[in-house]
Structures are given as C-alpha cells and as structure tokens.
Amino acid sequence: MIFVRVSAGASSLKSVLAAVGMLLLIAGCGGQSRAPEEPLTPRVKSVLPRMRYTVQAGAYKEIANAVRLTQKLLSQKLFAYHFIDDSGFYKVRIGNFPSREEAIERAERLKAARIIDEYFIVAPGDYAAAKSDLAHEGLLRQEIVRTAERFIGVPYQWGGESSVSGFDCSGLAMVAYQLNGLELPRTSGEQWQAGRPIPPQDLRVGDLVFFATRGTKKVSHVGIYTGGDTFLHAPSRGNTIQTASLSSDYFKTRYLGARSYL
C-alpha cells in the first residue's frame, strides 16, 4: 500500500497529483521540525497501544478524489489518510475510535452529511498485530518492515499544516506500525520515549534506531531497522525513502540508540 495524507489547509490539488505515493504528516523530524527535540533519557513503556476501530471509505481510480475526501475529513477535525491498496484503488481511513459503535456513529454522520458514501469498519482483529502472539512476533516484525519497504523511492519532504508533502522520518515509522495495528506516536521524540531500550547486539527487524543529527544529544532522526547493518528511513528534503548503513561514517557518529515496541 502507498499512503497519502493531506493537510486540511492544503490549497491546491495540483501538487498532490504530481506527488502520488507521498504522505503528509506534521513534521516530527527534518530541518524545520516544529516538534521539540527530546532528551536522551526515555520514559520506558512496556507495549504500544493497539489500533482500535477505524472507518474505511471510498474506492477511487483517481488520487484526486481521495485527496478531496481526505481534505473534507480533516476539515472536520478528524484524523484521516488515504492510500492505494493492492487492487490499485485509492481508499481513505478515518479515526481511531474506542468502539465499533462510535466508529459506526461517526461514519453514519459523515454519510448523512454526504461526505462519504459506503464504508466498512476496520476492527482491531483485522490488523497483523492482533494475529501475532509471542510465538509469532517475528512475523509481525517482518510485516512492519515489509510495509515500510513499500515506500522505498517515495520522496521525502518536510510536512507542514498548510502544504502537501511527503514522508518525514517519524511519519514513515508511525505509518508502518499503525498499518499493522500498533499505535506508535507521531514524533521521533515521542517514539524514543515510548520504546524499550535495546543494545546494538540485540537489534531485531522492526525495531527503531535513533540519531542526533543536529549537533546535540537529542533525538532528531529515526529509521526502521531491517536487519544486518541496514535501516530504512526518510533521509532529508530532496531525497527519497531509502535504506542506509548503520556503520556509515555519518550515522555511526550520530547514533543514540534503539527502541523495541514488541
């Protein structure tokens, strides 16, 4: 799947149509991030919350239609993003509701307002995380990496509230986890704090690796560990999502540590 999220303040679809495969998320890393850098010491949590009930609507051949629907939903102060599924259709997911009833209620209100047409509810049991127990944790880790790898080649572009943009580093991590049912926080600092510290020798695929790229000992960049010496990340403006080496001169001198959420 390729996910695209558009700010409610975006004024033009032209840039969207030129950016199929891009995702808009408020910046959590990047040269102009509005999110404050977080201290090195994490507040360790044991596990991430699971994704709950989500509304899925739309099945469009053209991305512009999914963009318009996403913009309408964001204008209603709803969390929303759209994506292309394996069939090649663009679809939209809305919210993260505590119960099926609340998801249906919201969907019916949107339907009555003619914002959406048909819909269905994505339940907690539909995600990969719900289908994996401790014995199958490795499969979930592989699925997180496989999800992230679908975005290789998608442009990085720092996101803002009134622009149409690509992934930033923490946005890539968040989407890879949330698509698999794990509610990873949005910013790199929050992600650092939410995980369990992992020494380099214990890294497993799907763990997140963190870096200080601004000359401080504060988190400013994150990637998804893919095995061996490599990780997947959204590097900087003007570049595409790609793999990189942990032992490269640049990253090994800026490495802060790793976090696991499983």
PLM segments and residue spans:
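Flexible loop/N-cap segments at domain edges
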Residues: G223
